[in-house]
A protein has these predicted regions:
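Surface-exposed, charged secondary-structure patches
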Residues: 4-11, 37-94
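Short beta-strand edge/turn micro-motifs at domain boundaries
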Residues: 84-86, 93-115
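Hydrophobic pocket/interface hotspot
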Residues: 16, 28, 36, 85, ...
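N-terminal amphipathic/basic helix or basic patch
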Residues: 4-15, 23-27
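Short, well-ordered alpha-helical segments enriched in acidic and aromatic residues
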Residues: 23-39
Length: 115
């Protein structure tokens, strides 16, 4: 039985969020596209790359951000090899763009702010 695209996208997003909270670099590695652009909605957008996200994850930077552990994922659209999703957690709200790769769905763009 194969997963639907929406199920696979939710799994990718959970790898990203739960990997962050748990300090699990393997899950984060799997979830993020090599060309990730992650930006925060703030006066200066800034930019986090995949390499920096893996570094921060390995340092356990997300462990204090778990809150109540809630991670609500909504897949808004899937069109061929691209998709968009949003995530609400106790700490973050994010909009994500994903791309289908030979290895599965990966997050290419993320725009976030604190909840």
């Amino acid at each position: 039985m194969t997963k639907t695209d929406a199920e696979a996208i939710v799994d990718t997003v959970l790898d990203y969020f739960e990997g962050w909270f748990d300090g699990d670099t393997a899950r984060m590695e799997r979830a993020l596209h090599p060309e990730l652009a992650k930006r925060r909605a703030a006066e200066e957008l800034g930019l986090l790359t995949k390499a920096r996200m893996l570094e921060l994850t390995g340092q356990g930077a997300g462990a204090e951000d778990r809150g109540d552990g809630r991670v609500d994922v909504t897949v808004h659209d899937v069109y061929g090899d691209i998709a968009t999703a949003s995530v609400d957690s106790a700490t973050y709200h994010e909009y994500l763009h994903l791309v289908r790769t030979p290895g599965g769905w990966q997050i290419a763009n993320a725009l976030w702010q604190f909840s």
